[in-house]
């Protein structure tokens, strides 16, 4: 009896200590509103289905305001859609690290720029920044133009043949660009690339990583085996690693022999050249080179494909804006067919800029991004967010806030980005590539690539769809996804 009493007393003291150690989190509930949820679960039961997450976030923000605090099980959790608070988070050195939800990326893609913790992230970012400089990006224009010309050839049989799902074609196209600008033009000679199996492998890993992010128990290999997800995932990871390692080893062998590299002259600015040079100097390991190369490809191909497709989809739903874009592009390129787009040409596409910005406002490439506080974070309003809080920055709802963007915030209208409409907006009200200390390293790459692609597609084709804008239903994912993807019809322009 005495032993039982002692054990109960010990458990009670441990429970009191546990509560006391988290007192600052509990005090935060008095300063920041939010759903209380249930004991142990917190608000997790509202977020069990991935299809419901964005809607649940929207309901919480409507009810409690643009910054809320609650719990995901035992984890203190904030949702933020207030531009000023977002700025506080993105510009703070105490909020550089990504949230724990991205643990799956380390396993699937590798430990690199996407998920590295500070200070290692800062070191890698500084070393890799030169690979995304302005002159380097301009050197990729021949690849952008060449690959878009091939895409036009692939689209030709689809014209006037009803509505089609173009996403697989666009993903194959953007994967081709991403691998070539990262590792060289000769990657297209690899068997896995020619057979299109490489795209399937990347898609398999992305799908499994997403499952792991939103179902944390799947981060365990044993649980993935029980769920029947491990074998294909492991095979996909292995084949992609072999593909990347083969390219790296060939590059290193060429450098060692002093032979002329097999890559073309316009490949001199490759990301792979930079990281292999860092390895020779002892700054990077072989695994660093593999991981960073892999992550750059992962980060580039799906988001760019989605951005292009969603823009075409929105223009098909709002044909008046598509016609205005077409007229602008036609003044620069009077003839249909293939043509080379220069950087100077992209600078003339003012209305296409408005369209692309508005497309990424209505459908941001990533709907929600996550950070965590590594030290106490003092917000502009004086509230201190303690160390250890997970923060979800809800880009999707901030981009659609009527308080920020006006009464038609939830519809597509490129006029939102006319100078007189955008000049008074908070600088962090529009963040398709995030912003601040840890912004997307490849945002300029994505914009130039998308503009070249859209210019050629819109000059050659009119895009139509029977799917109404009002029926779009967005699903929370690592990148923005649709529950039902609208099909597009192509009509040849003259």
UniProtKB/Swiss-Prot annotation:
<keyword id="KW-0560">Oxidoreductase</keyword>
<keyword id="KW-0503">Monooxygenase</keyword>
<comment type="function">
    <text>May be involved in the metabolism of insect hormones and in the breakdown of synthetic insecticides.</text>
</comment>
<dbReference type="Pfam" id="PF00067">
    <property type="entry name" value="p450"/>
</dbReference>
<keyword id="KW-0408">Iron</keyword>
<feature type="binding site" description="axial binding residue">
    <location>
        <position position="440"/>
    </location>
    <ligand>
        <name>heme</name>
    </ligand>
</feature>
<protein>
    <recommendedName>
        <fullName>Probable cytochrome P450 313a4</fullName>
        <ecNumber>1.14.-.-</ecNumber>
    </recommendedName>
</protein>
<dbReference type="InterPro" id="IPR036396">
    <property type="entry name" value="Cyt_P450_sf"/>
</dbReference>
<keyword id="KW-0479">Metal-binding</keyword>
<keyword id="KW-0472">Membrane</keyword>
<keyword id="KW-0256">Endoplasmic reticulum</keyword>
<dbReference type="GO" id="GO:0016705">
    <property type="term" value="F:oxidoreductase activity, acting on paired donors, with incorporation or reduction of molecular oxygen"/>
</dbReference>
<dbReference type="GO" id="GO:0004497">
    <property type="term" value="F:monooxygenase activity"/>
</dbReference>
<dbReference type="InterPro" id="IPR001128">
    <property type="entry name" value="Cyt_P450"/>
</dbReference>
<dbReference type="GO" id="GO:0020037">
    <property type="term" value="F:heme binding"/>
</dbReference>
<keyword id="KW-0349">Heme</keyword>
<dbReference type="GO" id="GO:0005789">
    <property type="term" value="C:endoplasmic reticulum membrane"/>
</dbReference>
<dbReference type="InterPro" id="IPR002401">
    <property type="entry name" value="Cyt_P450_E_grp-I"/>
</dbReference>
<dbReference type="InterPro" id="IPR050196">
    <property type="entry name" value="Cytochrome_P450_Monoox"/>
</dbReference>
<keyword id="KW-0492">Microsome</keyword>
<dbReference type="GO" id="GO:0005506">
    <property type="term" value="F:iron ion binding"/>
</dbReference>
<comment type="similarity">
    <text>Belongs to the cytochrome P450 family.</text>
</comment>
